[in-house]
């Protein structure tokens, strides 16, 4: 039976700022996967586009004195060009503000209405009396009702990460003018997401992709599934059918963009787009780990309600840190793709390698210039580049090219073993494992050449030296074929140095065992240049200056009097028990002895400590904080910690629980 085609999509970059390392964590692995799968004989279509709607773009456009459409077009062109420079080769890269996306969004929303999955409801929405406007999503900031942290109107981005519906945020403030907002009634439309609970659980059990996406979504659904408000009071966006005063929520039209972009590609290429979105499709979404909820719960529910096929797989990446700090544009912990990397003349292939080889796709990637330089020099230059150059140089110098004859069976067996392992890893979305396997073959080649020393052997046995080089050339060919999805530009350069005149990407990845014929080859040149310490230091200096500049811009905390400070009660405590909170990847529930009583405290440190690590640990507790419910769990106090990594404050010497901090 013929397999259905593979349609691969990437989460859409938002057109209100330039491309950075966090974006590439999604797009480079997706491109690597697409390149590999095509070269196994699969029919693959690769689409994405820019996300043009929603309040952040409207706010940014107003701040910059331009229109949302002009701002979107500016950054759409930027992303399109940047992805090309990074070797990310989409078949189609569209815009969600294009007519095709408007049409498909309104069609799907109308289907949901007709099928009874959408209803009207009056909600309390933040309203600015000064601006005389309702404040959807990021037009308003305030306090998260679940964890008490600073939050945006649609999401608690600084705390528990929970999606917020209109009217939920506490102490709302207008982001435009800073005026305290009030709540007023307004009619909106909701998707009956709760109606899909019985569908979503078995769907997730069968969903392919990475386990982090599947498990996170299952945790949400097993508790309570809330309906979603799918309209906003904005002029910019896709109009809700029959309502000129409302647009659909950006998380409705953004994923529908995947379908619209497929339609546009199909129209350009004489294909039927419905073939890629039928019931038995293989739609595979590559996304960042922060949008799992939208792609594994909201999106499949929406598709089901509208009568479309469900996603086949969701591949979610881990988050990105910079120099051990949480990725943050406002705090300066960001690496810009163009300004900091490509425009400095650094090879796109080396950054692709780092992103794929640093860690497993689902784990956190911590970028530092120092480690980047070390890995490129020690792995790419010293192992891969060294083997390819020394082998090709010797072949050209001593034999004028590739010697004739056969390849040792043991060498072919090693190549076949490598090809099989790479395929297993790629099919499982384990890109680091695949890269490590390829680099293992390069290391094997280096050891083989070093052990057999053809530069010595040729003095006494030219035929034996020729056999060693023949074997080395065969390994080099296999490496070219296997590394192409990771480093497409350098793989093509190597392919030409092997004497081929076509594209390496036109060949199957398993052709590494097809013998390289006897022929002349051009004089090779080193494929990779070492990154000098001075260059790395200069790149790092730019980052550190950016952090310092951001610190200067940070608003200083106002001074307080000793009387104000005396109102705060801080004591030592000892953790008696700790456990995870269902559905939250950030929060732990702790039982803490503070001297004479045990307090239950919810703390956002789950990303840094396992529950059993905390039991018995001495901590510092703010004890007279008003009780609050966080994620539905009562919290009576606050554990004090320092920095983005939540380093717990603890006494240097043993003290009794309940000792006051003075």
Swiss-Prot record:
UniProt similarity note: Belongs to the class-I aminoacyl-tRNA synthetase family. MetG type 1 subfamily.
EC number: 6.1.1.10
Encoding gene per record: metG
Sequence positions that bind Zn(2+): 144, 147, 156, 160
Domain tRNA-binding: 564-662
Annotated motif 'KMSKS' region, positions: 326-330
PANTHER family for this protein: METHIONINE--TRNA LIGASE, METHIONINE--TRNA LIGASE, CYTOPLASMIC
Keyword vocabulary terms for this entry: Aminoacyl-tRNA synthetase, ATP-binding, Cytoplasm, Ligase, Metal-binding, Nucleotide-binding, Protein biosynthesis, RNA-binding, tRNA-binding, Zinc
Catalytic reaction list: tRNA(Met) + L-methionine + ATP = L-methionyl-tRNA(Met) + AMP + diphosphate
CDD domains: Anticodon_Ia_Met, MetRS_core, tRNA_bind_EcMetRS_like
Name by which UniProt lists this protein: Methionine--tRNA ligase
Database matches in InterPro entries: Anticodon_Met, Met-tRNA-synth_bsu_C, Met-tRNA_ligase_1, Met-tRNA_synth, Methionyl/Leucyl_tRNA_Synth, MetRS_core, MetRS_Zn, NA-bd_OB-fold
Pfam families linked to this entry: Anticodon_3, tRNA-synt_1g, tRNA_bind
The protein's role, per its UniProt record: Is required not only for elongation of protein synthesis but also for the initiation of all mRNA translation through initiator tRNA(fMet) aminoacylation.
Cellular localization per UniProt: Cytoplasm
Chain positions recorded as ATP binding sites: 329
Cofactor note: Binds 1 zinc ion per subunit.
SUPFAM superfamilies: Anticodon-binding domain of a subclass of class I aminoacyl-tRNA synthetases, Methionyl-tRNA synthetase (MetRS), Zn-domain, Nucleic acid-binding proteins, Nucleotidylyl transferase
Cellular component annotations (GO), alphabetically ordered: aminoacyl-tRNA synthetase multienzyme complex; cytosol
HAMAP family per the UniProt record, alphabetical: Met_tRNA_synth_type1
Superkingdom per UniProt: Archaea
């Amino acid at each position: 039976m013929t397999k259905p085609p593979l349609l691969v999509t990437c989460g859409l970059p938002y057109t209100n700022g330039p491309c950075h390392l966090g974006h590439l964590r999604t797009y480079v692995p997706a491109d690597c996967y697409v390149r590999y799968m095509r070269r196994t004989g699969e029919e693959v279509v690769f689409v994405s586009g820019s996300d043009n709607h929603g309040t952040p773009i409207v706010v940014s456009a107003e701040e910059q004195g331009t229109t949302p459409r002009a701002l979107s077009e500016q950054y759409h062109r930027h992303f399109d060009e940047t992805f090309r420079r990074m070797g990310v080769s989409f078949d189609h890269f569209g815009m969600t503000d294009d007519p095709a996306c408007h049409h498909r969004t309104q069609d799907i929303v109308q289907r949901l209405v007709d099928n009874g999955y959408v209803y009207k409801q009056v909600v309390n929405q933040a309203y600015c009396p000064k601006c005389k406007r309702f404040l959807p999503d990021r037009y308003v900031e305030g306090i998260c009702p679940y964890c008490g942290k600073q939050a945006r109107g649609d999401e608690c981005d600084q705390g528990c990460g929970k999606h917020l519906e209109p009217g939920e945020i506490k102490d709302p403030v207008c982001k435009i003018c800073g005026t305290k907002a009030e709540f007023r009634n307004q009619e909106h439309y909701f998707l009956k997401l709760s109606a899909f609970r019985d569908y979503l659980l078995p769907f997730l059990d069968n969903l392919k992709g990475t386990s982090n996406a599947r498990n996170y979504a299952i945790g949400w659904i097993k508790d309570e599934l809330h309906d979603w408000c799918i309209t906003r009071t904005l002029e910019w966006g896709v109009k809700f059918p029959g309502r000129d005063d409302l647009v659909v929520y950006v998380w409705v039209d953004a994923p529908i963009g995947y379908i619209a972009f497929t339609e546009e590609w199909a129209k350009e290429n004489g294909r039927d787009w419905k073939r890629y979105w039928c019931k038995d499709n293989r739609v595979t979404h590559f996304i960042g780990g922060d949008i799992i909820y939208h792609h594994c719960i909201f999106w499949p529910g929406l598709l089901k309600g509208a009568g479309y096929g469900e996603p086949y797989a969701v591949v979610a990446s881990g988050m990105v840190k910079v120099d051990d700090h949480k990725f943050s544009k406002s705090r300066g912990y960001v690496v810009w793709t163009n300004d900091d990397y490509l425009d400095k003349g650094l090879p796109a292939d080396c950054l692709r390698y780092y992103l794929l080889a640093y860690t497993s796709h689902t784990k956190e990637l911590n970028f530092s210039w120092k480690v980047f330089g070390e890995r490129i020099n020690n792995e790419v230059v010293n192992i891969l580049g060294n083997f390819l150059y020394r082998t090709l140089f010797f072949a050209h110098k001593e034999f004028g090219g590739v010697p004739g004859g056969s390849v040792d069976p043991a060498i072919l067996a090693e190549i076949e073993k490598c090809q099989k392992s790479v395929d297993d890893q790629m099919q499982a979305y384990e890109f680091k494992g695949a890269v490590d396997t390829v680099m293992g073959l390069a290391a094997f080649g280096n050891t083989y050449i070093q052990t057999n020393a053809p530069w010595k052997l040729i003095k006494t046995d030219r035929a034996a030296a020729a056999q060693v080089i023949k074997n080395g050339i065969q390994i080099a060919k296999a490496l070219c074929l296997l590394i192409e999805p990771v480093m497409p530009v350098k793989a093509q350069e190597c392919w030409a140095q092997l004497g081929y005149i076509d594209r390496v990407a036109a060949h199957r990845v398993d052709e590494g065992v097809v013998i390289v014929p006897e022929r002349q080859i051009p004089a090779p040149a080193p494929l990779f240049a070492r990154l000098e310490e001075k260059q790395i230091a200069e790149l790092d200096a730019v980052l550190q200056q950016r952090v310092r500049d951001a610190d200067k811009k940070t608003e200083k905390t106002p001074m307080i009097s000793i009387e104000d400070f005396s109102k705060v009660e801080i004591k030592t405590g000892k953790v008696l028990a700790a456990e995870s909170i269902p559905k939250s990847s950030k929060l732990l529930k702790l039982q803490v002895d503070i001297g004479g009583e045990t307090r239950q405290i919810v703390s956002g440190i789950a990303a840094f400590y396992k529950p059993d690590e905390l039991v018995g640990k001495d901590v510092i507790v703010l004890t007279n904080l008003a009780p609050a419910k966080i994620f539905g769990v009562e919290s009576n106090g606050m554990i004090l910690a320092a920095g983005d990594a939540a380093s717990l404050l603890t006494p240097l010497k043993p003290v009794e629980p309940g000792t006051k901090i003075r």
